[in-house]
Every structure is written in structure tokens, then in C-alpha cells.
Amino acid sequence: MTSLWLPATGKVYLPPSTPVARVQSTDEYIQRTDIYYHANSDRLLTVGHPYFDVRDTADNSKILVPKVSGNQYRAFRLLLPDPNRFALVDMNIYNPEKERLVWACRGLEIGRGQPLGVGTTGHPLFNKVKDTENANNYIVTSKDDRQDTSFDPKQVQMFIIGCTPCMGEYWDAAKPCDADAGQGKCPPLELINSVIQDGDMIDIGFGNINNKTLSVNRSDVSLDIVNDICKYPDFLKMANDIYGDACFFYARREQCYARHFFVRGGNVGDAIPNTAVGQDNNYILPAASQQAQNTLGSSIYFPTVSGSLVSTDAQLFNRPFWLQRAQGHNNGICWENQLFITVADNTRNTNFTISVSTDGQTPTEYDSTKVREFLRHVEEYEISIILQLCKVPLEPEVLAQINAMNSSILENWQLGFVPTPDNPIHDTYRYLTSQATRCPDKQPAPERKDPYEQYNFWTVDLTEKLSLDLDQYSLGRKFLFQAGLQRASRVSKSSAARASTRGIKRKRR
């Protein structure tokens, strides 16, 4: 039997000419110590109107009551002290000439106060035309069929932990091509990435879209999101981040079901295919001319969802979470001494209804014309974290990766390039404000700007909240127990006690 040799017909893939830089995990170059700190915030409270900002009628720019809704994100920015400036008890922990200290997040607990409750939202002029699930007669629309409608939103519990802000995504109107531009046409859509800030709205069942540009009738969604952007965390982008700073880990729980089924009012933009496009009788058969069905109703169907049951059995909050291995290359290292915690929770969504008398008198009988009704929503948070002290060696490979990731980290460590002085002596004037002395330099030294000053976060200062006494705090005791540190201390204490007891008995003999 003879064999026939044939040349390879497939494509040959060659490796790239330039090597691809490999990003190291923080566990490969950071040395962890056995020193742990506990930090917790104060009781964080906020009160406001659940649907919109209440503004001053005389001055539109002045907000009298801010918008505080259970359907908003709470984006906390925790500021941690610089460990390199700590007065450590043991100064032999690290060598400041060869190492720098950083924090690593090992555990956290997001505490939430207030009882569980379901909050409703809605619109006094909601764009819906009757119920389409159990219709008794064919729907005939008019010029304005909007109704006063309310519903409960989709149930959301979520938090994302990282050392940079959480990234979100939403759909917005894109710029159309010149050939596709025109009045009354549906705009093209594009996916937008942006930072999730404190006060941004979550998806409550109508999708993560920009309602300011995609809802011109101001009636398609509820009042709390009709003039806002609903964002959803971009888990795919954060999971594929090369450094993994935006999301160490996250927890998420969402649930909803379609409760009511409606149809939108207005002209249908994309008509059902018919004879005009060569699709006659493919989708519908026309009705007789004397029937009401001869004039087709709207086919823009949509549901109003419900978050259903709210229970303590499925709560993500008021319980500890421990970080052993993050999803990315950053295993919990808090670069630049800060931590971002983005929270969404509408299981405590009760809106207070407050009634007051318009004339200041105590009413003796009910009269709705003499009563004013107000809405308020309150939220209560408390954040506790466990931090581990870690060392970063000042080696060329490590510094090169940190500089490529974020050069400001090295600037804060005062590792920047120091130029050689060109003149050993400089001029220093006295009486700078005197008319006889030359004017001082008008260009002061540039101050380092906050890279997140353009964003809105709930800043929590923990620079003076750290403690080594972990057993004095609830989260600290839980950490000692799960890490086995408490048991080891007990064994050492009991063994020391037995040794001392034996020594006393020998002396008595």
C-alpha cells in the first residue's frame, strides 16, 4: 500500500512578532502580613422625595427636597488612611526604602436598617390603552387614552465591590446616517458605558435605556425614571478587565413577573407587513368593513412587572462576605487607599405618606380639600470592613506594572523622577507684599486633582475609624471565628494556664 503526500492546504497561524505583556496577579508580588484592622462607618441616613427633586418655585436651581428613591444606586466611596504614614507598633514590619504598604479587603458587611416593604411607582398620565390579556371588546383608541396607573417595580438586590467605580451600561439614541435621517423615524441605538454614580436609577422593568431621549411623550414609564437614565452594571466588561479593579466580586439577586399586560397608545411606527411589502395575509387576515376589527389596534404590547414577595429569607444584606479570591487579577488590593461599594436594594422601598392640615387646625371631620399629602422615602446604611496590611516590594518589574496600571500610585508613594538641581542656591525674597519687592510667581505649583471629582459618590471617611481590636466589633468577631484565629488564641491561653498551674503544684510539693 502506497501513501501519497499532499501539501497542507490550511492556513498557518504565526505568533505575534512582538510579545504580549503579561499582567501579574497581585498575589504574585504582594506579601500579606498577619495584621488585620476593622473599620466601620457611622449610621448613614438619607431622606427625600421618592420620585423627583422638589425645587423652589422662585429659584429653579435651588433644591428644597432631594430625590431619594429605593430604586436608586447608592455608590459609596470609602476613604482609607495611608498605611505608609501609620505609627506602627512594630516598625520592623516593612522596610520603607524597599517596600510600601497597601490595604487588602478581606471581608465586609453592608448593614441595612428599616423594615422590608414594597414601594409603588407610577404616572398620573401613563401611556396604556386598557388590558390586552382579557379584552371583552375590541379596543378603540382616541387622541389621549392615558390613565393614572401605579405598580411595584422589579425586585433588585445587588452590590459590587472594587477599588475603582462600578461601570454601567445603557442604550441611547445614536446619530443616524444621512440617508436614514428623517422625521418620525426610529433612531438607531448604541450601547453606552458610563460610571454608576450615587443616585442613578436601576432598571425597574422597562429596560436600561435613556428615557430622556427615547421617551419624548413623557408617558411611557413611571415618574421616577421618566427624566433619568436607567443603568445596569456591565458585568461582562468588568469581568474581562485586565486589572480587575472595578469589581473584586459581586452579589446579585433579581426577580420579577409580568403582572398586567397593556398596549401603547399612538401610531404604530413599524406596521404589520401587508400587501405594500408583498406580505399579504402572511400575518393577519383583514376583517369585514362593518367590523370594529377592520381598523387595526396597536401592536405595541408591554407588561408592567411586579417584584412579588419580599422576604428575609433571601436577603443579601446584614450578613458578612469574605474575599478569598477575586474574579480578576486584583485580589482585593485597595489601590490609592479607597474602596468603592455600589449598592442597589429596593426590598426596603416603603414610601411614607404624610398628611398635614392646610389651615393649621386640628380637623374634626374629614375634608380632602383641607389636607395636603406628601411622600418621603428614607434609607439607612452601615458599612463594616476587614482590612489586611500588605507589603509591595519596590522592584523594577512590579513598579513597571503599577506604573502602566495607574501612574498616580507611584506619585503618592513619592517615587517620581527627581531632576538634578541646576543651581545649588536660590533667591528668596522677604516682604513679598511690599511695593519695593518684585511680584511673586503667578503660577503656583499644580495641585493633584481628584480623578473622580466629576462624579457623584457618597463619600465615607474612614481615615480615623480603624481599630486593631477585632473582637470588639461584630464583623471582627465573625472574622476571627471563621479564620480560626480566635480558636488559636484560646488554645494558647489554655496551654499557658495549664503550664502555670503545673508549676505551682510542683512548688507546693
From Swiss-Prot:
Origin: domain of life: Viruses
UniProt GO MF annotations: structural molecule activity
Presence of the UniProt keyword Disulfide bond in the record: yes
GO cellular component: host cell nucleus; T=7 icosahedral viral capsid
SUPFAM superfamilies: Group I dsDNA viruses (SSF88648)
Subcellular location: Virion; Host nucleus
Keyword terms, alphabetized: Capsid protein, Disulfide bond, Host nucleus, Host-virus interaction, Late protein, T=7 icosahedral capsid protein, Viral attachment to host cell, Viral penetration into host cytoplasm, Virion, Virus endocytosis by host, Virus entry into host cell
BP term (GO), one: endocytosis involved in viral entry into host cell
HAMAP family: PPV_L1 (MF_04002)
Function: Forms an icosahedral capsid with a T=7 symmetry and a 50 nm diameter. The capsid is composed of 72 pentamers linked to each other by disulfide bonds and associated with L2 proteins. Binds to heparan sulfate proteoglycans on cell surface of basal layer keratinocytes to provide initial virion attachment. This binding mediates a conformational change in the virus capsid that facilitates efficient infection. The virion enters the host cell via endocytosis. During virus trafficking, L1 protein dissociates from the viral DNA and the genomic DNA is released to the host nucleus.
Binding partners and assembly: Self-assembles into homopentamers. The capsid has an icosahedral symmetry and consists of 72 capsomers, with each capsomer being a pentamer of L1. Interacts with the minor capsid protein L2; this interaction is necessary for viral genome encapsidation. Interacts with protein E2; this interaction enhances E2-dependent replication and transcription activation.
Family to which the UniProt record says this protein belongs: Belongs to the papillomaviridae L1 protein family.
Protein name (database record): Major capsid protein L1
Record organism: Human papillomavirus type 49
Lineage of producing organism: Viruses, Monodnaviria, Shotokuvirae, Cossaviricota, Papovaviricetes
Gene that encodes the chain: L1
